[in-house]
Amino acid sequence: MKNENSSFVVFDNTHSGILFNDDNHAQYPIRYYNVINGVGIIPESGHSYYGYIYKGSIELYTTTRYSQYLSEGMYFSLSEVFELRNFTNELSKVIVIEVVNGAGNYAQDKFSAMYQIGGQIEDKGRLKYIDGCTDSLLIAPVKKGNPCLNHLHFPAKIDQTQHTHPTHRIGIVANGQGECITPFGNLPLQKGTIFIIKEWDNISYSIALDGKRYANGQHAFKTTDSVMNVIAFHPDSDFGATDEIHPMINRTIVNGVSASTLSEIRTK
């Protein structure tokens, strides 16, 4: 069950399994899952996964590493087969994004997510965003262009500027409440709301409630008396390290010159 318009999709979080299958996307093939008490996903070897625990606690089990015990507000990424196991009697819920490594831009870039665990998320973001909002980069792109996982913080009484994104934004409300404002209708948001903000391809428009044409994916977030914290997965980025520019090579100095500018000694 879902509530959808031309900008935004809200999913029912009471059922486990695949929520959104976009594995035919030419550039960024992904799948989106809701995992309840460890049920709802069968990971595939060779794919990458990003997850966020939004209720209860789980054991992240793999055959190659020690088990990790994660609780609400924690997150992870990895590129191997895994299991999410309940280790208490309480209900556990996890959203998982699967990146199809062998297709689209991911195949060209030979992408593979690193094994990382973090959290809990903080009360606010570390970076300034727009209209009083802040954000933090929870899992950074391994290299420029790769996916990333973000925390977006909305203080109370935020009325965001309408905007679009060039790729899907896959998210969940970690805590608090607010509203997604779109020309095609508004959608309430509360803790545990799973959603997708649709990408805008620069050419697709739809007729809105006022009878005018607006870009698909146009939206803004609004809060009143409550703060709201959102976890958002981006399938791509225009930020991150490259083979020519990264902290290790930038700050390696040869006769007063950064090794980043010395092509003759850079690893080929």
Model-based region annotation:
Residues 149-167, 173-176, 180-182:
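A mid-sequence, solvent-exposed acidic-amphipathic segment
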Residues 163-165, 203, 219:
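Histidine-centered active-site/metal-ligand motif
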Residues 77-78, 181, 197, 205:
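A generic structural signal for residues embedded in beta-strands
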Residues 191-200:
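Ankyrin-repeat and related helical/solenoid repeat scaffolds used for protein-protein interactions
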Residues 81, 200-201:
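Short, surface-exposed secondary-structure boundary micro-motifs
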Residues 1-149, 155-156, 185-191, 207-268:
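Intrinsic disorder/low-complexity detector
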